[in-house]
């Protein structure tokens, strides 16, 4: 009976010592939080392991995260994965549709998000400035060149081929004019002015023939003249010669005849009236964006996501270096309080720490049992 009590006592003592030792070891991972001293003598094992190695832990965690966890290769694979691409595609499509179906205007977006004041007026001013710069640059580069050199080859050829058409058009308009009553009246006035300028000779002709008779004689002859093929060839030759002369003149000749301010203002106003985008600036997106929804969501969004993913994957290593993730992780871990870290670790590993304590008690009890047997055997 004494033997059983002795061995049981040894087992209990061993279990208590083993369990208490492991429990103390676990607590000494974190505690004490600060160094303890008795006079000038530092108490051993203070502070605890984690507080003592807090800075080294932060450095190693930063190194581990950058070189083994958040690597450029791993993030690049994630960016190009089908799951991520689909998630980004769906998210961007949803957000884009939400925006397109809203009451917001392009002007409001520019003003709220980019800080552009009076967006439409600013846009028109930028357009006007761009037109003015283009105007100045064109004449600065081409002022002393011939007009024929400056015009594109296609324009030159088109005008050359259009000369017969222009000649025919002018003759047709002339026939239409002088065959009408209005044209006849104008012709009569022209004859009057002509005869008036001829003095006595003109008066004699008017007196013998009469104005009406002269108009009646001249109008059919004029119509016959304008319908004649020779007249058409003559007009074509005149136009071709004048066009050839014009092409040999310097561009400066045109510049002298133009008013830059009027042209810039005219082109800006024409763009504002005829380019739909200028009108959309002040209209809600939902009023005009519907025809573009499918094109944007089906065609543009996937291409945009793919392009952004490729761009990020290509420059990811450089971006990570510029972000200095290692320093960020280190600073965050250093700023993390040991108390909070202890609470976090214990919350996650509470069951495992208890099992370690129980294991220490079990091993201590087994050692106590063996020691009891040895004592009895030796005694």
Curated annotation (Swiss-Prot):
Signal peptide: none annotated. The chain crosses the membrane at residues 6-26, 359-379. It is a multi-pass membrane protein. It is found in: Cell membrane. One of its GO terms (cellular component) is plasma membrane. Keywords: Cell membrane, Membrane, Transmembrane, Transmembrane helix. The keyword Transmembrane helix applies. InterPro entries: DUF445 (IPR007383), UCP032178 (IPR016991). It comes from the Bacteria. The keyword Nucleus does not apply. Belongs to the UPF0754 family. This is UPF0754 protein BpOF4_11355. The lineage of its organism: Bacteria, Bacillati, Bacillota, Bacilli, Bacillales.
């Amino acid at each position: 009976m004494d033997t059983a009590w002795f061995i049981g006592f040894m087992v209990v003592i061993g279990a208590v010592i083993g369990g208490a030792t492991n429990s103390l070891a676990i607590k000494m991972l974190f505690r004490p939080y600060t160094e303890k001293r008795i006079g000038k003598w530092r108490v051993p094992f203070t502070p605890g392991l984690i507080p003592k190695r807090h800075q080294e832990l932060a450095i190693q965690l930063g190194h581990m995260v950058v070189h083994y966890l958040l690597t450029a290769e791993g993030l690049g694979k994630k960016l190009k994965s089908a799951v991520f691409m689909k998630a980004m595609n769906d998210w961007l499509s949803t957000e884009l549709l939400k925006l397109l179906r809203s009451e917001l205007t392009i002007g409001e977006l520019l003003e709220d998000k980019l800080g552009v004041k009076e967006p439409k007026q600013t846009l028109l001013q930028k357009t006007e400035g761009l037109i003015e710069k283009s105007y100045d640059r064109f004449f600065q580069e081409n002022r002393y060149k011939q007009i024929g050199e400056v015009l594109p080859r296609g324009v030159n050829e088109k005008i050359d081929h259009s000369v017969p058409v222009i000649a025919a058009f002018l003759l047709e308009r002339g026939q239409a004019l002088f065959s009408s009553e209005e044209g006849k009246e104008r012709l009569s006035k022209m004859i009057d002015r002509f005869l008036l300028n001829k003095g006595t000779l003109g008066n004699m002709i008017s007196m013998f023939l009469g104005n009406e008779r002269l108009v009646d004689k001249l109008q059919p002859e004029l119509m016959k003249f304008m319908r004649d093929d020779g007249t058409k060839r003559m007009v074509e030759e005149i136009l071709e010669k004048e066009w050839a002369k014009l092409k040999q003149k310097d561009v400066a000749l045109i510049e002298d005849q133009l008013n830059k301010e009027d042209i810039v203002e005219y082109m800006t106003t024409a763009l504002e009236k005829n380019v739909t985008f200028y009108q959309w600036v002040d209209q809600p997106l939902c009023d005009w964006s519907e025809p573009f929804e499918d094109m944007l969501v089906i065609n543009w969004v996937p291409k945009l996501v793919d392009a952004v993913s490729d761009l990020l994957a290509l420059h990811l290593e450089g971006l990570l270096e510029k972000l200095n993730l290692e320093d960020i992780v280190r600073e965050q871990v250093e700023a993390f309080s040991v108390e909070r870290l202890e609470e976090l670790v214990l919350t996650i590993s509470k069951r495992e720490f208890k099992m370690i304590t129980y294991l220490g008690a079990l091993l201590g009890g087994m050692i106590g049992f063996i020691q009891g047997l040895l004592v009895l055997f030796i005694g």
